[in-house]
Swiss-Prot record:
Source lineage: Bacteria, Pseudomonadati, Pseudomonadota, Gammaproteobacteria, Oceanospirillales
This protein's name: ATP-dependent lipid A-core flippase
Record keyword Chaperone present: no
Predominant subcellular localization, coarse grouping: membrane
Domain ABC transmembrane type-1 stretches: 29-310
Residues holding ATP: 376-383
Function: Involved in lipopolysaccharide (LPS) biosynthesis. Translocates lipid A-core from the inner to the outer leaflet of the inner membrane. Transmembrane domains (TMD) form a pore in the inner membrane and the ATP-binding domain (NBD) is responsible for energy generation.
Ranges annotated as spanning the membrane: 24-44, 65-85, 143-163, 165-185, 253-273
Domain named ABC transporter: residues: 342-578
Notes on the domains: In MsbA the ATP-binding domain (NBD) and the transmembrane domain (TMD) are fused.
Length: 585
């Protein structure tokens, strides 16, 4: 168990969980009132037994009329209590689910990139869907049973004490015995619940990977492999669920057997004249009815333990994510629009404290409006360097200055407003063309501005040919568009944002040469008047850059124009020869 999970173990988790009830306390109070009414009606039903017996022993017209009315009244009251308790608790449950999911999702949007690097999408989605439902079961469904059946037991026990406190003392011995049994199974329930939640995350993760990569799966014949992977995850989930069911199936009848033995002993003692005393036949039957009626609510109270333990285990997982530290945003400087001068001074960075440095002693100056290309072999640190600009990761060594001001002095929102990013991994949403271009903070853009951005990105032609033009739904990640069309959509989004700094991280590497050539004019339009950093794989696309920075093993090894570096006949020239010799071959 993690430190966070330990910190909020047991009652502390439930206490934090119940804090979600505060905004809904009025509705919750109505649910409690309904359960109290239900419990009182159940106790009244036991007491009504003596009136029924009396009416049978001494028949009278009044008894014949009043006893049936009493029964109808008690059941009507019980029905009212059941309705109020059930309906208002359901409203509380939906309210908690909604609030917790919103809080979880909101927190997810402000977590640092490192968190997403170490957590799979499937597990994160499973927390928002499956785990929150389990938590709600503990917070509401379990409370319904605890309140309704708990008040019922209290009401019946109170009545039994009133009728014969001596007999009832024996019944109270049940408490510690049942408590020991519940304590044992609770630990097992919680342990298995954690495994079930983890396995549900595995199931979701495998399914989402297979669905998202269905083209690769079919192309490479991975259907059987993915099926077996999913089957193993699902079988583990079933195994843990069956262990939970087995524990619950064994604990419930054992507790019921203990209760039945005590009730039998109670009846045996009550039949003794010395113990029974002056109890009438009606009072005796009413007492036995109350004692036997206690069995059902006590059984339900023990069964709900499984729900509570599942909820506590799920809550530990949910609270663990909610307690994850958010992105550091200690800067306060808000810039309207920067000029775009960047300076890297002795910059160093590693993805982990123990890991090998990804960047070492980076010193570089980029003037406003310059186009700087970053080239080098895979793993040389190109993408890492550009990812530090919008502070997706925080650097600890050296400094990055933007217009002479340390990057960490900028408020994150202000800093990221100055930067547009176009990568090889195009992200489009299952929304309209307009909403994909005018995304997020750009939502206030006018239709004319969106259209102009699409035109500048050379996307207007294919957009107008879509069924509903700018109102066409694109499907998940724009599956209805070709690779080049999807890339032009992202360029249109960047044009609409109109940021002074542009990052092109292998923006055309996923396209073929023909598509890349067609999109080049849109990229040139996007780059005009902006400080542009281009992470390039194809050297032919960056020959006109103002400055080419060659990186190797996290260090800058060469800087210069294309002509200067070719004449120097160093690392860049070697890369250039290698790439163009492969192209000729």
């Amino acid at each position: 168990m993690s430190k966070v999970a330990k910190q909020y173990a047991g009652a502390q988790v439930y206490g934090r969980l119940l804090s979600y009830l505060k905004p809904l306390w009025k509705v919750f109070a109505l649910a409690v009132l309904g359960n109290v009414i239900y419990a009182l009606a159940s106790a009244a039903m036991a007491d009504a037994t003596k009136y029924i017996v009396a009416a049978i022993e001494t028949p009278s017209p009044e008894g014949r009329l009043l006893v049936p009315m009493l029964i109808i009244g008690i059941f009507a009251l019980r029905g009212l209590g059941s309705f109020c308790g059930g309906y208002f608790m359901a409203r509380v449950a939906r309210g908690i689910v909604h609030r917790m999911r919103l809080e979880l999702f909101r927190h997810l949007t402000v977590l640092p990139c490192r968190f997403f690097d170490s957590n799979s999408t499937g597990h994160l989605v499973s927390r928002i869907t499956y785990n929150v439902d389990q938590v709600t079961g503990a917070a509401t469904n379990a409370i319904t049973v605890v309140l309704r059946e708990g008040f019922t037991v209290i009401g019946l026990m109170g009545y039994m004490i009133y009728v014969s406190w001596k007999l009832t003392l024996l019944f109270l011995v049940l408490g510690p015995i049942i408590g020991v049994l519940i304590g044992y199974v609770s630990k097992r329930f919680r342990r298995i619940s954690r495994r079930i939640q983890s396995s549900m995350g595995d199931v979701t993760h495998v399914a989402s990977e297979s669905i998202g990569g269905y083209r690769v799966m079919r192309t490479f014949g991975g259907e059987e492999y993915e099926f077996n992977r999913f089957m193993k995850a699902s079988e583990y989930n079933i195994t843990q669920a069956l262990k939970m069911s087995l524990t619950q199936a064994l604990s419930t009848p054992i507790i019921q057997l203990v209760i039945s033995v005590f009730i039998a002993l109670l009846v045996w003692l009550a039949l003794s004249p010395e113990v029974r005393g002056n109890m009438s036949t009606g009072e005796f039957l009413a007492y036995i009815t109350a004692a036997t009626t206690c069995a059902k609510p006590i059984r339900q109270l023990t069964e709900v333990n499984a729900v509570i333990q599942r909820g506590i285990s799920a809550a530990q997982d949910v609270f663990m994510q909610l307690d994850e530290p958010v992105e550091k945003d200690e800067g306060s400087y808000v810039a309207d629009r920067v000029q775009g001068r960047l300076e890297f001074k002795s910059l160093g960075f590693a993805y982990s404290d123990e890991g090998k440095p990804a960047l070492q002693e980076i010193n570089l100056v980029i003037e406003p409006g310059e186009t700087v290309a970053l080239v080098g072999r895979s793993g040389s640190g190109k993408s890492t360097l550009v990812n530090l600009l919008p502070r997706f990761y925080d650097y600890e060594q050296g400094e990055i200055l933007l217009d002479g001001k340390p990057l960490k002095d900028f408020a994150l929102t202000s800093l990221r407003r100055q930067i547009s990013i176009v990568t090889q991994q195009v992200v489009l949403f299952n929304d309209t063309v307009t909403n994909n271009i005018a995304y997020g903070a750009l939502a206030d853009a006018t239709p004319e501005q969106v259209r102009e951005a699409a035109k500048s990105a050379d996307a207007l032609g294919f957009i107008e040919q879509l069924e509903q033009g700018f109102d066409t739904l694109l499907g998940e990640n724009g599956t209805r568009l070709s690779g080049g069309q999807r890339q032009r959509m992202v360029i249109a989004r960047a044009l609409l944002k109109d940021s002074p700094i542009l990052i092109l991280d292998e923006a055309t590497s996923a396209l073929d040469t023909h598509a890349e050539r067609n999109i080049q004019s849109a990229l040139e339009t996007l780059m005009k008047g902006r400080t542009t950093l281009v992470v390039a794989h194809r050297l032919s696309t960056i020959e006109n850059a103002d400055k080419i920075v060659v990186m190797d093993q996290g260090r800058i090894v060469e800087v210069g124009s294309h002509r200067e570096l070719i004449e120097k006949d160093g690392a860049y020239a070697a890369l250039h020869k290698l790439q163009f010799s492969e192209a000729d071959a």
